[in-house]
Design a protein with these regions (language model features):
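Short acidic-hydrophobic, aromatic-tinged amphipathic segments that line or gate anion-handling sites
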Residues: 127-132, 183-192
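Substrate-recognition element of Asp-dependent hydrolases with the DxDx(T/V) motif
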Residues: 66-71, 75-109, 113, 130
Length: 244
């Protein structure tokens, strides 16, 4: 049996498409439908911090906004097939989402997951919501979750620093994390799930440093502090970041 944590937005759900829709609902045709951010903060979008704040304000006022996200069909399909053909695994869908009008984030996520046809079958599947991605590592450590996948490189590095047991954290390749020097990467959720089946992680540390600076990422406390400091700046508020 394995305990596995899977991020939702950027792994199962297409947040980018939904956020583009929110932008264009305020400023028609501001972003092309096929726009792809090249970093977490959407700096190539041309949106100012004030404009991003305005988009988030509208999202937060939209009832049950999280229910409207499209799924990454390949990843959702891979998870559905994996759960249908495996037994006795604990799968946690862990997401950091801003609070919006309507149902709670957890309930919206639960309804969305069911609408995608995801069923645990002979496994257990639960939902965990956190207010910020930098809290995921604490949750995983407390629950002794052994495997995780995320599209945010800081979260993957932080989870890789869990010291009380061997946690195997992987980064799902996306355009907004391509410059992060994270060794444990996969191209698809299916690739990650096959690693869970194998039971072995890639050798070596999760990462060494981020390409844009000297934030070391190894196994010492200074790395954890540096990662937390970065998350405090970038992930502290939805208005500064693409996502919490």
């Amino acid at each position: 049996m394995a305990k596995v944590a899977i991020d939702v937005d950027g792994v199962l759900a297409d947040f980018t498409k939904a956020f583009i829709g929110a932008v264009n609902s305020i400023w028609p045709a501001r972003l092309k439908p096929d726009f792809v951010p090249t970093d977490w903060d959407w700096t190539n979008s041309g949106l100012t911090h004030g404009e991003i704040s305005k988009v988030w304000w509208k999202i937060k006022k939209t009832s049950n906004w999280w229910l409207g996200l499209d799924a990454y069909s390949d990843n959702v399909g891979a998870l559905a097939m994996w759960m249908a053909s495996r037994t006795d695994h604990d799968i946690w869908l862990c997401t950091s989402r801003a609070v919006v009008a309507g149902l709670t984030c957890a309930k919206q996520t639960d309804i969305w997951v069911q609408s995608c046809g995801l069923r645990p079958v002979n496994n257990f599947m639960g939902i965990i919501t956190v207010t910020n991605g930098n809290k995921k590592s604490m949750v995983y450590e407390a629950a002794e979750i052994e495997w995780s996948i995320d599209d945010k490189w800081e979260t993957v590095i932080d989870c890789g620093l869990i010291g009380s047991f061997e946690h195997k954290a992987y980064l799902l390749n996306q355009t907004w994390n391509k410059d992060a020097s994270v060794y444990r990467r996969v191209n698809t959720l299916e690739d990650f799930l096959l690693k869970v089946d194998d039971g072995k992680a890639n050798a070596g540390p999760v990462a060494v440093r981020h390409a844009s600076g000297d934030r070391a990422a190894g196994v010492d406390q200074s790395a954890r502090n540096l990662t937390a400091a970065h998350q405090g700046r970038v992930g502290e508020t939805s208005e500064r970041s693409r996502r919490p």
